Amino acid sequence: MTKKALSAVILAAGKGTRMYSDLPKVLHTIAGKPMVKHVIDTAHQLGAENIHLIYGHGGDLMRSHLANEQVNWVLQTEQLGTAHAVQQSAPFFKDNENIVVLYGDAPLITKETLEKLIEAKPENGIALLTVNLDNPTGYGRIIRENGNVVAIVEQKDANADQLNIKEVNTGVMVSDGASFKKWLARVGNNNAQGEYYLTDLIALANQDNCQVVAVQATDVMEVEGANNRLQLAALERYLQNKQASKLLLEGVMIYDPARFDLRGTLEHGKDVEIDVNVIIEGNVKLGDRVKIGAGCVLKNVVIGNDVEIKPYSVLEDSVVGEKAAIGPFSRLRPGAELAAETHVGNFVEIKKSTVGKGSKVNHLTYVGDSEIGSNCNIGAGVITCNYDGANKFKTIIGDDVFVGSDTQLVAPVKVANGATIGAGTTITRDVGENELVITRVAQRHIQGWQRPIKKK
């Protein structure tokens, strides 16, 4: 059988009142990206040719936060129920394609579960995703006859036998475009809320003698939504534990999975060790035998083999060569590139600079817009003065240079190979090869000096 084309509808128009936030509900993040972005990504992985994103509250924020997403923006000006939301996108449906309905506040739905749902969809019928709950209170119960779904009964309308049913509706469903358009046009709003409900499609399909089947999600968390921050935090912890478990099984030593956050993607080598309270953001690549100390934050970095990053260091948009040592309390800002066997120590900040092989910047130093050669020693308290209040300028330091403590290098300036700069020096002109430069005033000794006396 030829596989049908697929489109997705993502309902994301809700305000999220219980979030107590100016952000639309679906823009609140788990694992570093908006809930709705997780759903969009899953729809892409599923092979959806079109993704119709139904939006309403906070429309400008939605469009700005998701500006790069390949979606068809469909505005729902009034929120009149789930069927009304899907109906806004119905003009875009092709009759012979499958349509899967997803929810922007249920971010953990997986490609594998949706594939099973699509595969189970009967011709001209509906496949409904359900789940078994130990406590189904408040959810619509699934009523079956001969295995098929004949109705969804809401809690308030259920009789005693129906209240004992554990299988409930998740709202996720698949049907073809023609059937969706036909049934959506017949949905009424004759209910207490005066809204148009997607669950009414089940009865309409049965009226037309079209089969409705149910596929059960094996993991309840896949279909859990987040209506408040407590539920959002529960989804976050679940996903973080799932990600940490996967990494542990791949050989990464995460000392405490409950205190590890992955907010992006992590590519890793062998024998990687990650201590507690480490945050990984964006795209991070770790080589073999990398050790990351407690409390570090790594964002969009590439780390070579045998690197140790000591506690409480922050690295962003940087590259670190093999056998380097970073921290503790180091900061690598965007554009920092450290060669092999470099040392960057406590309270050192490096931005948009390269540091050559074997060079050391060990204490209390700022290096910005600079090039440092190999086997250099940059002493404590050194500052590259790269900004004149309007423009940035470069400092270029050659190989085998020794820069003494408390030195200021006022850019633009070049220091040639083998130069030595004495402690406390301010460099304003280029330094030649193998030169010693020192600008300190002569030390004076004044005998019998009397300290000032406080006036009464």
Swiss-Prot record:
Sequence segments annotated as region (Linker): 230-250
Enzyme class: transferase
Involved pathway(s): Nucleotide-sugar biosynthesis; UDP-N-acetyl-alpha-D-glucosamine biosynthesis; N-acetyl-alpha-D-glucosamine 1-phosphate from alpha-D-glucosamine 6-phosphate (route II): step 2/2; Nucleotide-sugar biosynthesis; UDP-N-acetyl-alpha-D-glucosamine biosynthesis; UDP-N-acetyl-alpha-D-glucosamine from N-acetyl-alpha-D-glucosamine 1-phosphate: step 1/1; Bacterial outer membrane biogenesis; LPS lipid A biosynthesis
Cofactor(s) listed in the protein's UniProt record: Mg(2+)
Residues that coordinate or bind Mg(2+): D105, N227
Domain of life per record: Bacteria
Organism encoding this protein: Haemophilus influenzae (strain PittGG)
Residue numbers spanned by region Pyrophosphorylase: 1-229
Protein's name according to its UniProt entry: Bifunctional protein GlmU
Co-factor binding comment: Binds 1 Mg(2+) ion per subunit.
GO BP annotations listed: cell morphogenesis; cell wall organization; lipid A biosynthetic process; peptidoglycan biosynthetic process; regulation of cell shape; UDP-N-acetylglucosamine biosynthetic process
Molecular function GO terms recorded: glucosamine-1-phosphate N-acetyltransferase activity; magnesium ion binding; UDP-N-acetylglucosamine diphosphorylase activity
Pfam families found in the cross-reference section: Hexapep, NTP_transf_3
Similarity remark: In the N-terminal section; belongs to the N-acetylglucosamine-1-phosphate uridyltransferase family.
Catalytic activity: alpha-D-glucosamine 1-phosphate + acetyl-CoA = N-acetyl-alpha-D-glucosamine 1-phosphate + CoA + H(+); N-acetyl-alpha-D-glucosamine 1-phosphate + UTP + H(+) = UDP-N-acetyl-alpha-D-glucosamine + diphosphate
Keywords: Acyltransferase, Cell shape, Cell wall biogenesis/degradation, Cytoplasm, Magnesium, Metal-binding, Multifunctional enzyme, Nucleotidyltransferase, Peptidoglycan synthesis, Repeat, Transferase
Record function comment: Catalyzes the last two sequential reactions in the de novo biosynthetic pathway for UDP-N-acetylglucosamine (UDP-GlcNAc). The C-terminal domain catalyzes the transfer of acetyl group from acetyl coenzyme A to glucosamine-1-phosphate (GlcN-1-P) to produce N-acetylglucosamine-1-phosphate (GlcNAc-1-P), which is converted into UDP-GlcNAc by the transfer of uridine 5-monophosphate (from uridine 5-triphosphate), a reaction catalyzed by the N-terminal domain.
GO cellular component: cytoplasm; membrane
The encoding gene: glmU
Enzyme Commission code(s) on record: 2.7.7.23, 2.3.1.157
Entries under InterPro entries matching the protein: Bifunctional_GlmU, GlmU-like, GlmU_C_LbH, Hexapep, Hexapep_transf_CS, MobA-like_NTP_Trfase, Nucleotide-diphossugar_trans, Trimer_LpxA-like_sf
Binding site for UDP-N-acetyl-alpha-D-glucosamine: 11-14, 25, 76, 81-82, 103-105, 140, 154, 169, 227, 333, 351, 366, 377
